[in-house]
A protein has these predicted regions:
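Short beta-strand element of the alpha/beta-hydrolase
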Residues: 45-52
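The serine-hydrolase catalytic nucleophile loop
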Residues: 54-66
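Conserved alpha/beta-hydrolase
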Residues: 69-88
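Conserved acidic catalytic loop of the alpha/beta-hydrolase fold
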Residues: 99-117
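Flexible "cap/lid" loop of the alpha/beta hydrolase fold
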Residues: 127-134, 138, 142-169
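Short beta-strand/loop motif that positions the catalytic acidic residue
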Residues: 210, 216-218
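Conserved loop-alpha-helix segment in the C-terminal half of the alpha/beta-hydrolase fold
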Residues: 220-245
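Catalytic active-site module of serine/aspartate enzymes centered on a nucleophile-bearing elbow/loop
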Residues: 243-265
Length: 265
């Protein structure tokens, strides 16, 4: 348990890294007035990439998937989820509750006039992707990377421990590494705490009703978020692919990109 939890900090910060960000895109005003930073590149069928905890849109540019999608002719949309990067960082419960992050993406899709789209999430981005495939009928195909079934538990211990630590509880030693990383990089602790407090869970009943094609993809050495085979059992017809690497490295691999390109065809 401690080993798994201590890896929390690196869930996305390393695999879809923490990178200095210069604005090259635009801002979208979401349903509650929160400004969401995004970039669009390419001319083909739209694919939205959803980063994970402490990540930003720019992390995707340092892996294999982003350039592979552009080369394959897709229109690629990357965004900073609220509380991250160049997007606004609300310090209220309302700023993150009730699927706010999924609503941001759905609103962005509407503003871009996409009739349909595919979505790829990694780690916490897969948790948001899970909400999208339940809430948004415009999704054609979805990919969830680096995620097992643990997030379906509303009382997921790791989420609760992370929230408490971010709020100042110094007894949550299983997330000490996470807190060191956050302090080192001067992240907005309160915004991150609200993200953990209101991190959505998707019920097994909701997942059982999913009708679209879903690809589950993880690293051969990744045990960070539970067993992906357990999640596959919950989503009818979902496919599962394993690629080399652990939670921090699998999402950057050529094999990760190739599996997704093949699935989206």
């Amino acid at each position: 348990m401690k080993k798994i939890l201590s890896a929390f900090v690196i869930i996305i910060a390393c695999s879809f890294g923490l990178h200095a960000q210069q604005p090259e895109g635009k801002f979208f005003k979401s349903f509650d007035g929160t400004k969401i930073y995004y970039e669009v590149k390419g001319e083909g069928y739209p694919v939205i990439l959803v980063h994970g905890f402490t990540g930003t849109s720019q992390g995707w540019k340092h892996g294999s998937l982003y350039p592979a999608l552009l080369t394959a002719g897709y229109k690629v949309v990357i965004l900073d989820q609220r509380g991250n990067g160049l997007s606004d960082k609300p310090h209220t419960d309302a700023g993150y509750a009730n699927d706010a992050e999924a609503k941001d993406i759905m609103g962005l899709v509407s503003s871009l006039s996409f009739k349909n789209y595919d979505v790829v999430g990694y780690s916490r981005g897969s948790i948001i992707t899970s909400r999208l495939i339940v809430l948004d009928k415009r999704i054609h195909k979805a990919v969830m990377g680096g995620m097992g079934a643990d997030y379906t538990n509303p009382q997921w211990p790791r989420r609760i421990h992370a929230y408490k630590a971010l709020m100042g509880d110094t007894t949550m030693h299983d997330v000490d590494d996470m807190m060191v990383w956050i302090r080192k990089n001067n992240f907005d602790n309160l915004a991150l705490a609200y993200q953990q407090k209101h991190q959505p869970s998707t019920s097994k009943k909701e997942l059982a009703a999913v009708k679209i094609p879903v690809l589950l993809i993880d690293g051969t050495e990744d045990t960070t978020n539970g067993d992906v085979t357990d999640l596959q059992k919950l989503i009818p017809g979902s496919k599962m692919v394993s690629v080399p690497g652990n939670h921090n490295t699998a999402g950057n691999t050529v094999q990760f990109a190739s599996a997704i390109i093949d699935f989206l065809k």
